[in-house]
Structure formats: structure tokens, C-alpha cells
Amino acid sequence: MGLGRYEFLADYGDGFIAYLNGQEIIRVNLGAKDTPVAHDRSTDRSHESHIYRQYEAPVDGFYIDSAIVRSLIHPGENVFAIEVHNDSVANDLSFACTVYNLKNNGWYNIYNSVFRYYRQVPLDSSKFPIVVIETDEMGIPQIHTRVRARMKVIDKPGLKRPTDLPVYEGYISIERKGESSAWFPKMSYNLETQNADGSNQNVSLMGMPAENDWVLFCSFADKSLIKNELVFMLGRKMGHYEPRTQFCELIYNGEYMGLYYFAEKIKRDKNRVNVGKRDTVFPENGGYVFKYDKPTRKLVQFIYPDKDEVTTAEKNYLTGYIKSFEATLKSSKFLDPIEGYRRYINPYSPIDYIIINELTKNCNAYLYSTYFHKDSRGVINYGPLWDYDLAFGGASWQEGTLTYKWQFEFNTDLNIKLMLRDTVLKNRLAERWWKLRSNFLSNDSLMHYIDSLYQATTDSRILNYKVWPVEDKYLFGPDHYVASADEEVAFIKDWLRKRLAWIDANIDKIYYSARC
């Protein structure tokens, strides 16, 4: 068998060093690479093995590239040695490992522990803020399980280094974010900044207004790493609140995890979704933030009031309001100036939402991660925008890869097609489209935004793909294959030009009979 790339799977407690023919190739929780380690040294931090955790989860897979293997392997006998250390003098030392040859496996399988791995790469410096998170020995376990941790944010002017003094250091509560994506090797996280007693601590981070709920988003399925930021920027240019974001680097329990972006979590706040406070006595007087999302589909998920705190009266009021809106859309009175559908929604609000989701042909549009808000005694508004890493031709399902057809005709849950029977709304949609096309949605402007975002992340993106050697691998979603992030951006731009041309040719042709 020829020499190839290898993966070293390790289930350990609490740290180890791996050597190939006497040369160190992997080190975990035992100080800096190639520094001497006494035989009785304890580890830098605790790490409980998965065997002792007693739950099913992939163990850590470390990538060993072919250049290292070729430089260290020689003809004849070779020695692969492991030095294992505990966090203290105790009888719970544990270690198990396996080595796989990856030479003939091009597909990086996010759901198969054999083919999901990362490379240990040190972070020397970055122009982006550095987020450092330290958990206890259990790490961040299964989905929807919050744990206490510590977080530092390094964000001085100029280049930032992991050794710099932090501008913020404190406690957080953190959990894996997402459903299927929560099992990706590179994970996104929801986190809450806290005081020592566990109460919320509102802090201003990376230039964003003070709050306590945040998201660390990695966009693992998006090889360009810029789709979400591009869409949020377009939403802001349209004049709407979209979550503020900042690219950042993540160091998790001593390991550099690559490029992320730090984002505001969608919630009610004067600097986020600015709706009125709840009214538990007269629920129609309260503000609401809610969404449609899997697995509930047509059921409302409450964001504000919190789903665990919402009263029966509030739930009945909002669900009743939405059901009345949907029933009116399907009735003969849907265009009635007094009793029609416009009494329930801001008639301008769907327009920009439709434009963004048709421009990107987001496969999840009108179906998943779809947010709404309603102010006190007000009507429903669409937004904020969220979750576009599979947009721009990035998904092979729900017609997400097509540059033609309307996405609202495929994903029908939000009844966009029914609303567009209203010729006033349809004409406003076309007028808005052409106005934006002559401005920041022009071909030249969009290509410029893509190039600017992509170039701004160059150094961090290159380092990210050293950590996660998947740039040339087929990942999650697309029916196209690209061998690099550069090729992915070229694909996005070509796909977008075709999509824009199709919308230009069809936006004025939208017509649905009042009886459809």
C-alpha cells in the first residue's frame, strides 16, 4: 500500500503525545509542540474519554498529511508511539486509538467518524478578533445540552494574538447549535454571557450593542465561508435589521478551530428586533418574535416571549391571529380593503423577503429558519434573515441548485403564491426589484461585494482549510463538486449571474388567478 494521508482517531483522558519514529506529530493538552514533558507531568486541562462519558458521539480525529508521513517513514520497521498523561494522580487513565489510511477516500463524510478529522494548526495572529473558550473535562456534549464555560475575547487594534490581554473575560453558557449541523465536525454554538452567579450579563462585544445572547457560526457547508454575511449585508442595505456579525477566530480548549463569525442571536431588544414588551393580561398589546422551522413546520415557534415562558393566552392569541390571516388568504375576501389579508401583515414587508430568497434561491426559504415579528397591536412583518449557507446553488434538494423557477412555488408553506394574486403586491414586487437592480443588486455591485468579502477573509480562510482539510472534498448539500474555495466563489458568481438574468426575464410575468 502506498503512503497517503492518515487519520488518527483517539479517545483519551486526559492528554497525549503521538510520535512517528521518534518525531512528534500530535500533541494534546501537554503544552507547546516539541517542548520536553516529564513522565509525571499532569495535563494542561482535563478531558474525559468518551468511554467514561457514556454517550454516543464521534471521538477526535487528527489529520496527518502525506508530506509528514513521507518525511518520517522509512523502509523496514517503523515505530508509532503514544505517550499518555492524566490530569492528576488517579486511576482513571484511559486511551484508545485507531489509524486509518485516507489515500483513496475523497469524500469527507460528516456523519462517519472514520472520515471526519482536523489538523492541529497553531494560530499565531489574525486581523479578526480571537475567541477563546474553555470548558470542563466533558466539553460540550449532545445537542441542546447547555454547559458552563469560560470565554475570552481578544480584540485589540491591529493584529490580534492569542497571548494578548482580552477585552472581555467571563463565564458563558454554551450549547451546540442546529439540528443536523450540530453533528458536523466543525460545530456552531449558541452562547450566553453570564455573571459568576449564572445570571445574564449584557456586554458589548466586537463593536456590537450590549446583550447576552450570541451565536458562533461556522458555515461548514459553505466552502466560500461568506454566504451568510453577504445576505445579511444585502438585508441591511434594504433598510432592515439583520443580525450584526464579525468574522473571528476560535480557540476551543486549546485547539485552533478555524474561521467563524460572531453574531447577534435573533431576539427582542431595542438594538435587535425592536418590538414592544409582552403583556400577559392583554396579549394583543404585546410584541412577538416567532418563526417557522423544522420539525414544527406550520406550528409557531416562539422566540419572544420565550417558548418556556409563553402563556396560554399569548399562544392562543398569536396562533389565532396567524390562522385568521391564512384563512383570509384562502377566502373570497382576501382583497377586501377592510377584512382582507392586508389587515394582518405589513403589505410591504414580504417584498424584500421574497427578493432576497429568490435572488439566492435559498432551498430552505419559506420553510425553515423563517423569522417574523409583530409589534404591540401591530401586524406581522417578515424577518430578520437567517441561515443562507446552502443558498446560491448550494443544495441538491428542494430545487436549490436551479437558476430558474420561483422558490415560493416549491416551498408553499408561507402562501407567497396566494399573496401574489394581489396585483398591487405583485406590481410593488416588480417595481422594487428593478429599483434595487439599478442600485446595489446590479451585477457589478453583487460581484464586487462577493469579491470584497472573499478577499477580506483570505488569510484566515487559508488557515481554516489547513485545520479542516476539506476544501477539495464533497461536503454537505451540493450536486456540484469544486476542488477549492476559489472554484466555489467562481461557481457562486456564475450561478448568480444566471439567476439574476432569469428573474429579470420573469419578474414582470408573475400572474396567479384569484382562484388559484
Predicted stretch roles:
Residues 1-20, 80:
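Aromatic-lined ligand-binding clefts that engage carbohydrates, nucleic acids, or primary amines
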Residues 113-114, 120-123, 127-130, 138-141, ...:
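Middle-to-C-terminal accessory/interaction subdomains
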Residues 192-198, 209-219, 238-243, 255-355, ...:
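Internal "kinase-insert"/substrate-recognition segments embedded within catalytic cores
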